[in-house]
């Protein structure tokens, strides 16, 4: 019987398979940041252990960093302690660190792919739930907890049960203006925020393979938001072209040999999935979340749903609670509500193509007077590229704030956050209660939709812009 892409990568990494036990997988890459690593390094220190494979471990600072200054004190004492501790730990254990002053610093899931650290067929872990991003390369990538971070640091392995498999196929081509973010939000709207629980998802279909690597990263980034353990997309020529020539990618004949192997990383024709979900790309419109989980999402031209429209009593109760928290009225349009803040950034949408998409909307226009709009590139490399293209000038002339790289307003762990009841159009991945600040109201959208909301002062359908 044939194997799925996930099964091929999983099986290739089984180091120990004792009877009656979950297999132990070898881990090819371990990405580390300042928030989930301090206790893991403490554990090594207490037990007198070293980092097993320093050459496969890469650290950066992203969650706590200020986006207005490189001053390590700017985000408060706890942030300073976490960043200083990461510096100390990386120096002591010999781990490569891209700190806040390094030219490669950035959000861990932006930094890894752009440097060629992320490669097809690998197992990749990080103490961060959105590690699934790297699955866009056909790698098995997933988030782990701090005790598991310690285990990988010490052994370069991890005990990991085999997951069920789900195929999500997006058939046909999307309409003009529809982005990867719209595709993945539409998928989560279809599956719900728990529909992928217990599964590793493979995304496929023409609408997926048409995406650039950056678009594919956006899709896989949000696999966790439908409850999945990880999300993968089979590598192809788009993947190989992206990887070629990057800092840590194979070079010359090694690259050619790697590509030959990478070409085998696809689901066999006769392979069986445990579940299959199908969407028609032509049906996907610009998406906006209305509730407090990413599955509570509608097309921008749809009315806000009424709780009684949900047959499931749990979903109905969830909708009632979400509408109350979000300050929304069923039946109205989301465009009836002003936004207070706009955030273009996060590991979902802070790469150069995201910057370009937002700049295209911003060019020659002005941010509404009541809106604060932040553009936060995902890394120093993205920032430099955007500035070389003059995108920062476009944003600043339009009234957007051009910031330094970091996780920023995706989560309220630094100075970029919402005040109580402030409404935000955000390109991030989570719209949970309080995610962007206490009592903050988050609506997830694409970079183009976010930029358009900043200018109009409320949500608009980008298909209707001049």
Swiss-Prot record:
Q: Tell me, which GO biological process terms does this entry list? A: L-leucine biosynthetic process
Q: How is the cofactor bound?
A: Binds 1 [4Fe-4S] cluster per subunit.
Mind telling me which InterPro entries this protein's record contains? 3-IsopropMal_deHydase_lsu, Acnase/IPM_dHydase_lsu_aba_1/3, Acoase/IPM_deHydtase_lsu_aba, Aconitase_4Fe-4S_BS, Aconitase_4Fe-4S_dom, IPM_dehydratase_rel_enz, IPMI_cat
Would you indicate the residue range of the signal peptide?
A: none
EC number of this enzyme:
4.2.1.33
Q: Which GO terms describe its molecular function?
A: 3-isopropylmalate dehydratase activity; 4 iron, 4 sulfur cluster binding; metal ion binding
Q: In which pathway does it act?
A: Amino-acid biosynthesis; L-leucine biosynthesis; L-leucine from 3-methyl-2-oxobutanoate: step 2/4
Top EC class per UniProt? lyase
Cofactor names from the entry are: [4Fe-4S] cluster
Catalyzed reactions per annotation = (2R,3S)-3-isopropylmalate = (2S)-2-isopropylmalate
Query: Which keywords are on file for this protein?
Result: 4Fe-4S, Amino-acid biosynthesis, Branched-chain amino acid biosynthesis, Iron, Iron-sulfur, Leucine biosynthesis, Lyase, Metal-binding
Keyword rRNA processing listed? The answer is no
Q: Which CDD domains match?
A: IPMI
Positions binding [4Fe-4S] cluster in this chain are 347, 407, 410
Q: What does this protein do?
A: Catalyzes the isomerization between 2-isopropylmalate and 3-isopropylmalate, via the formation of 2-isopropylmaleate.
What is stated as this protein's family in its record? Belongs to the aconitase/IPM isomerase family. LeuC type 1 subfamily.
Q: What is this protein called in UniProt?
A: 3-isopropylmalate dehydratase large subunit
Species of origin reads Vibrio campbellii (strain ATCC BAA-1116)
């Amino acid at each position: 019987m044939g194997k799925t892409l996930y099964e091929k990568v999983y099986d290739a990494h089984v180091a120990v398979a004792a009877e009656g036990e979950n297999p132990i997988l070898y881990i090819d890459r371990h990405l580390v940041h300042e928030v989930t690593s301090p206790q893991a390094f403490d554990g090594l220190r207490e037990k007198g252990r070293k980092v097993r494979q320093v050459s496969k471990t890469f650290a950066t600072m992203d969650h706590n960093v200020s986006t207005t200054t490189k001053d390590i004190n700017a985000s408060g004492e706890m942030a300073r302690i976490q960043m200083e501790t990461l510096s100390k730990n990386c120096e002591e254990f010999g781990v490569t660190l891209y700190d806040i002053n390094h030219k490669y610093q950035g959000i861990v899931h932006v930094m890894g792919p752009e440097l060629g650290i992320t490669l097809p067929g690998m197992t990749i872990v990080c103490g961060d739930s959105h590690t699934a991003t790297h699955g866009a390369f056909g790698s098995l990538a997933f988030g782990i907890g701090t005790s598991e971070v310690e285990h990988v640091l010490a052994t370069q392995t991890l005990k990991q049960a085999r997951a069920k498999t789900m195929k999500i196929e997006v058939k046909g081509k999307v309409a003009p203006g529809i982005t990867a973010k719209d595709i993945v939000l539409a998928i989560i709207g279809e599956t719900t925020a728990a529909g992928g629980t217990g599964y590793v998802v493979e995304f496929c279909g023409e609408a997926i393979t048409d995406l650039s690597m950056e678009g594919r990263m956006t899709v896989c980034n949000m696999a966790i938001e439908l409850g999945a353990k990880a999300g993968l997309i089979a590598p192809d020529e788009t993947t190989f072209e992206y990887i070629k020539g990057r800092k840590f990618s194979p070079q010359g004949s090694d690259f050619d040999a790697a590509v030959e192997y990478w070409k085998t990383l696809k689901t066999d024709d006769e392979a069986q999935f445990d579940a299959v979900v199908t969407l028609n790309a032509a049906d996907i419109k610009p998406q906006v979340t209305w509730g407090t989980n990413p599955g509570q999402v509608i097309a921008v031209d749809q009315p806000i749903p009424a709780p009684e429209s949900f047959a499931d009593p749990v979903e109905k109760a969830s909708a009632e609670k979400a509408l109350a928290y979000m300050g929304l009225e069923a039946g109205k349009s989301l465009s009836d509500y002003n936004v207070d803040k706009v955030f273009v950034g996060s590991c979902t949408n802070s790469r150069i193509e995201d910057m370009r998409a937002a700049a295209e909307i911003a060019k020659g226009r002005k941010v509404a007077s009541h809106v604060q709009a932040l553009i936060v590139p995902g890394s120093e490399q993205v920032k430099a590229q955007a500035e070389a293209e003059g995108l920062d000038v476009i944003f600043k002339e339009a009234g957007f704030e051009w910031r330094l790289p970091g996780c920023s307003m995706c989560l309220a762990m630094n100075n970029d956050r919402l005040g109580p009841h402030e409404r935000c159009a955000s390109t991030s991945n989570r719209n949970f209660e309080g995610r962007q600040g206490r009592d903050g109201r988050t609506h997830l959208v694409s970079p183009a939709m976010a930029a358009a909301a900043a200018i109009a002062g409320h949500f608009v359908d980008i298909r209707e812009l001049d």
